[in-house]
Amino acid sequence: MIKYTPANQLTLAAFSHPFGRALSPKNRWVKLAALIPWDALAGVYAKALSTTSGRDSIDIRMVIGALIVKHKLGLDDRGTVAMISENIYLQYFCGLQSFQVAEPFHPTVFVDIRKRMGGEQFDMWNELIIEKADSLKPKKERNINKDRDSDEKPTANKGTLKIDATVADQKIVFPTDANLLHTARKESERIIDILYKQTGSKTKPRDYRRVARKEYVAFSKKKRKSKKEMRKFIGKQLRYLKRNLSHIEKLLDQIATLKKRQELPGMILGIKEKHPHQFPTSKRDQKIYWVIQHIYHQQKYMYDTNTHRVADRIVNIYQPYVRPIPRGKDKQATEFGAKISASEVDGMARVEHISWDQFNESVDLKLQVNAFKDTYGHYPTLLLADQIYLNRGNRKWLTERNIRIVGKSLGRPSKQPRNAYQKRKRKKEQNQRNHIEGKFGQGKNAYGLSNIQARRSDTSESWIACIFFVMNLVKLEKIAELHAILCAFLKKLISLNVKMVQAHLQLLDNSPKLKMTDSQIV
C-alpha cells in the first residue's frame, strides 16, 4: 500500500506541537516546503512502488523530504534521521502532522530508496523543478514552450546551453599496487580460515601471513621507495597471493568431495544434500574471492610486462566497478569515480550520462542538445562547450539546426581579424561557460560530489543524481526570492502611482482656476 499525504492537507497552522510558540512562516524550511511541487514529485516516485504486494510504504513526502535534508545539510544516513527527529521544522517539511520524538524510519531505508530511485527518476524530478522555476519568471524570460500544435512552424531557437564533464570521486582509499595486493592477501587469508573450519582437517595450509605482514610493515615505513624495492615487494606479495589462491582451490575441492560423500553438512545452516550447489562462503566473500583472482591476474600481467597499464583495472576490492579516470588536471592527474556529463541552463543543472569507464564526452553532445529540446520545446541559440566537443561531425550537426557555437575554428585561421566588438562579444560568451564549472565546484565543495559514500554502483549513481536535484532546489529558492522582491516592488510602485493619481485629481478639484462654469463649458 502506497502512503502519501497531499500537499494541500498539510498547513503550518494545523501542525500540532507541545511548545507554546507558533512556528515561524519565515523559516527557510517552511518557505522551501511551499515551493516544492510535492504532488508531482510523489507521482514519479510512486511509479517505482507496487500497489498489490509488499508491506505499507513510508509516506512518500517523508522520503522526498529526507533526501533533500540529507544532501542539503551534508549529513550521513544516521545523522539525517536523527536531525529529523530533533528538529520541529524538518518534521513539518517532511510531512508529519505533529511533532514526534521517535525516529521516522530506520537509517537503512535510505539504501532501499537509493536502489529504487535511479537516474531517470531524478531527471524527471529535475524537469519538474525546472518547470516550476520557469513559471516564476516573467513571460518574456521564460524558455519552456511545449504548448504548441504540431502543425505550427518550428519554434525559433532560444536560450544558452552549457555542457561539460567531470568526475564524482568515490570515497575509497587511494589505490597503490602495494596496498591493493596487501589487502587482497589479507582477504585471501580470511577466506582460508573460513574454508578450513568446514573441512575438519587437522593440518592447516601454510600461508606465511606473519612473514608477509612483517615485510609489509617494513616496506610501508620507508619514506622513499626506489623502483627496485617496489618491484621486489610486489613480486613477493604476488607469490604470497598465488599460494593462498592455490590453497583456496584445494580447500574448495576438498569440501565438495566431502559433501558428495555426505560427510559434512551443506553450508553453515546445516542443510544436508547429496550434490549441494551452495558455495561454502557468503555471497560477499564469494564476490571478494572472484575480485581477488582478477586483481592477481592484472597485477601479474603488469609485473611481467613491467608496465603500469591494464584494461579494466580494479583499484578497490570492495568496489570493483570503480575505475581510474585520467583527467590531466594540475591538482590530480587521475581521479577515481564515476564520470558524468552534465548541462546547465539558467542555473539549473542536469546529468545526462553517468559511466564508470573512461569515455570521450563529445559523444554526449547530441544527447544533451536533444534533452534540452525535450525539456524546453526548442533548440538553444548558443552552445558553450570545451574544444573536445566541437569536432567536425558535431559542428555539422549543430549547423544544420542553426545552433551557434563559440570556439576555435577548424583548419587554417581566418585572414580577416575580428574587430573590437566581435572580440568583446566572444570573450563575454566564453565567460558564460564558467557557470557549468561553478556548478561542479558547488557540488564538490558544498554537497559532497567529490566524496560519494555509497557502496554500490547503482546507489552511487542515485547519490550523484540527488546532489544535482538538491542544487536545483537551491537555485529555485533564489529565483523565488527574486520573484518575491520583484512582486513587492511592483506592488509598491503601483500603490505609489495610485496615490499620485489620487493626489492629482484632488488638486484639480480644489483649484479655483481650473474649475469651469456651465456657460464656459457650453
Provide a role label for each language-model segment.
Residues 27, 64-66, 80-84, 106-110, ...:
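Short, conserved catalytic/metal-binding motifs centered on acidic residues
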Residues 321, 329-375:
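Electropositive, glycine- and tryptophan-enriched low-complexity nucleic-acid-binding patches
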Residues 37, 54-61, 72, 102-105, ...:
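Secondary-structure capping and boundary motifs in well-ordered enzyme cores
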Residues 1-36, 481-522:
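Charged, often Cys/His-bearing segments associated with DNA-binding zinc-finger transcription factors
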Residues 53-58, 88, 384-392, 411-412:
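Acidic, metal-coordinating catalytic cores used for nucleic-acid/nucleotide bond scission
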Residues 23-68, 72:
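Basic, short loop/linker segments at the boundary and entry of helix-turn-helix/winged-helix-like folds
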Residues 387-457:
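Helix-centered, glycine/charged polyanion-binding patches within enzymatic domains
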Residues 97-319:
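Active-site- or DNA-interface-adjacent structural scaffold in DNA-acting proteins
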